[in-house]
Structures are given as C-alpha cells and as structure tokens.
C-alpha cells in the first residue's frame, strides 16, 4: 500500500488544485463515482475499475468509488510527520495510545461520512478509522516503486 504522501502525490498528478484536473467541480463526475452518480440514481456498491477517466498520469479511481487504506497512522496534521518511519508500518503493525487510528483516503461512492460528496473526494481529504474497520466502501490500492 502507498503511504499517505504517496497516495496524495498520485491523486494530484502534479497539481496543487483540489483535484488532478483542476478545481472545476462540474467535471468531477467524469473522474469519480460519487453519491450523485450512484446512490442518487439507484446504483449501490463499488463500480468497475476504470469506469471513469484517469488522471493525467493514467491512474483511475483515486476519487470516489471506494476509500483506500494507506500505511499511515492518523495524526490530525500529518505534514510534520511525513518522514517519520514509525507512522508507515502497515495495517498489521500494532497501534499505540498516541496514534490509535489509521488513515483512509479518496472518498467513496456512498454516503459514509461525507465520502460521496465533492468535498469528501478531494485530493487532500483524510478519514480516520480503527485498523479493524470493515466496510464495503473501503478498499486498498497496491503500490510499487518505479525504477529510476
């Protein structure tokens, strides 16, 4: 799984906007499965991978569809901790009193929290769950290093 920083880097695809394609929310349904184009139209559950446009790096489904676990423990502001190795030990590492929750990114197709809204799927949106949380709106993404 990617770290939180790796996930956001891939989701932004080099952009500093809310979404990899810019800030124009009217384009969002071209890139994401949200509540507005699933539940509100009578569709339930995750959609087929690659059913929406990829970002400019060719990555699909980073916005909506299912939220994705990342390696990090949840901290309210993760930027100071990006390079702290003990926050990147994977879901099976023991939680501790300081960081008992895990991070989930990307938003989802449905209404768990605000995950199915334009705000809920933006690149910087973060969710926190216990490591044993199970939901049909949470999944994971495999990641790999790209040889230089």
Where are the regions a protein language model picked out?
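Proline-centered helix-kink/hinge sites
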Residues: 1-2, 54, 131
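Short, well-ordered junction/capping motifs at the entry into regular secondary structure
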Residues: 30-63, 79
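Surface-exposed recognition segments
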Residues: 15-16, 63-148
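Signature tryptophan residues that serve as conserved aromatic anchors
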Residues: 7, 33, 57, 67-69, ...
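Short, solvent-exposed coil/turn segments
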Residues: 26-27, 42-45, 52, 97-99, ...
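Short, well-ordered surface patches within globular domains
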Residues: 1-29, 69
């Amino acid at each position: 799984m990617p770290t939180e920083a790796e996930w956001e880097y891939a989701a932004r695809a080099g952009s500093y906007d809310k979404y990899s394609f810019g800030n124009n929310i009217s384009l969002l349904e071209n890139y994401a499965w949200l509540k507005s184009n699933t539940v509100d139209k009578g569709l339930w559950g995750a959609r087929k991978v690659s059913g929406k446009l990829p970002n400019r790096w060719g990555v699909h489904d980073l916005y909506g569809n299912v939220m994705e676990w990342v390696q990090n423990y949840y901290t309210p502001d993760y930027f100071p901790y990006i390079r702290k190795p003990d926050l990147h030990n994977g879901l099976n590492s023991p939680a501790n009193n300081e960081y008992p929750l895990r991070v989930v990114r990307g938003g989802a197709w449905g209404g768990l929290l605000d995950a199915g809204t334009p705000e809920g799927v933006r690149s910087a949106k973060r969710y926190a769950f216990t490591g044993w949380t199970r939901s049909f709106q949470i999944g994971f993404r495999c990641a790999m290093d790209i040889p230089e």
